[in-house]
């Protein structure tokens, strides 16, 4: 039997509140993270992802208190990211109740951090978050046409997103969270081309993120190679439930829990 596709609500947290915007801007309050986490657990979410969206750009540490309170209330795996810069940061988050930790900007600056975390805690703990966008006409391009960005998509790195995902997996990342900055918050669907290209280069689990707006957007992401599908605003604002997404995946022939 094939491995079940995971459905993962994402909680973008700013100053202890869940927020959602378009392309990480114009943030709108979406509620209390602990309450939302409990709701998604009850709805049958397979995991939760918690991202401190101010931690990297504002150079603030992730809010351990919110992680701790969330972990006390939910019993599904919790991935936490945002502002993770060191092995010590990972250890603090795991002690607070995280099951997996997302690393992004710090790994770009110092790729060996991936191996250090994987060696200390195991590859299964480490999720590499890749915020990628398509290069525009007239801009310097990458081999795949997808560039890794930082600071909520506001800063290009010149790194090819497909190459970076492949390299990170080789260095020890246990999972790739691939977030399309072009699609983020638009509700226009996942970037299927980018998913397909990354899937061709990595064997570790791949999480599709950015662009979910309708129940019909999820099965094509799985067909493009995603092992898990992540969404935020469609869940937070009640447009879709986790169960509806699982029904659509099941109808398309995917195994779900």
From Swiss-Prot:
Belongs to the HisA/HisF family. The gene is hisF. Coiled coil: none annotated. Pathway: Amino-acid biosynthesis; L-histidine biosynthesis; L-histidine from 5-phospho-alpha-D-ribose 1-diphosphate: step 5/9. This is Imidazole glycerol phosphate synthase subunit HisF. Keywords: Amino-acid biosynthesis, Cytoplasm, Histidine biosynthesis, Lyase. Heterodimer of HisH and HisF. GO terms for molecular function: imidazoleglycerol-phosphate synthase activity; lyase activity. One of its GO terms (biological process) is L-histidine biosynthetic process. IGPS catalyzes the conversion of PRFAR and glutamine to IGP, AICAR and glutamate. The HisF subunit catalyzes the cyclization activity that produces IGP and AICAR from PRFAR using the ammonia provided by the HisH subunit. GO terms for cellular component: cytoplasm. It comes from Kineococcus radiotolerans (strain ATCC BAA-149 / DSM 14245 / SRS30216). The active site is at residues 12, 131. Its EC number is 4.3.2.10. It is found in: Cytoplasm. It is an enzyme of class 4 (lyase). Its main location: cytoplasm. It catalyses: 5-[(5-phospho-1-deoxy-D-ribulos-1-ylimino)methylamino]-1-(5-phospho-beta-D-ribosyl)imidazole-4-carboxamide + L-glutamine = D-erythro-1-(imidazol-4-yl)glycerol 3-phosphate + 5-amino-1-(5-phospho-beta-D-ribosyl)imidazole-4-carboxamide + L-glutamate + H(+). HAMAP family: HisF.
């Amino acid at each position: 039997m094939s491995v079940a596709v995971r459905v993962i609500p994402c909680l973008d947290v700013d100053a202890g509140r869940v927020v959602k915007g378009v392309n990480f801007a114009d943030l709108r309050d979406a509620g209390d993270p602990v309450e939302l986490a409990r709701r998604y657990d009850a709805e049958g979410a397979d995991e939760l992802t918690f991202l401190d969206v101010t931690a990297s750009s504002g150079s603030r540490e992730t809010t351990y208190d919110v992680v701790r309170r969330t972990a006390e209330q939910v019993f599904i795996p919790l991935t936490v990211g945002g502002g993770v810069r060191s092995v010590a940061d990972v250890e603090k988050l795991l002690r607070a109740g995280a099951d997996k930790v997302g690393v992004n900007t710090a790994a770009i600056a110092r790729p060996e951090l991936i191996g250090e975390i994987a060696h200390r805690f195991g590859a299964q703990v480490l999720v590499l978050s890749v915020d990628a966008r398509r290069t525009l006409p007239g801009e310097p391009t990458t081999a795949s046409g997808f560039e890794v960005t930082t600071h909520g998509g506001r800063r290009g790195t010149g790194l090819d997103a497909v190459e970076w995902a492949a390299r990170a997996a080789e260095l020890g990342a246990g999972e790739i969270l691939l977030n399309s900055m072009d699609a983020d918050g638009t509700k226009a669907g996942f970037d299927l081309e980018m998913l397909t290209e990354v899937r061709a280069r990595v064997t570790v689990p791949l999480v599709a993120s950015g662009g979910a707006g309708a129940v019909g957007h999820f099965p094509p992401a799985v067909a493009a190679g995603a092992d898990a599908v992540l969404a935020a605003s469609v869940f937070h604002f009640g447009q879709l439930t986790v169960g509806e997404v699982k029904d659509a995946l099941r109808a398309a022939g995917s195994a779900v829990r």
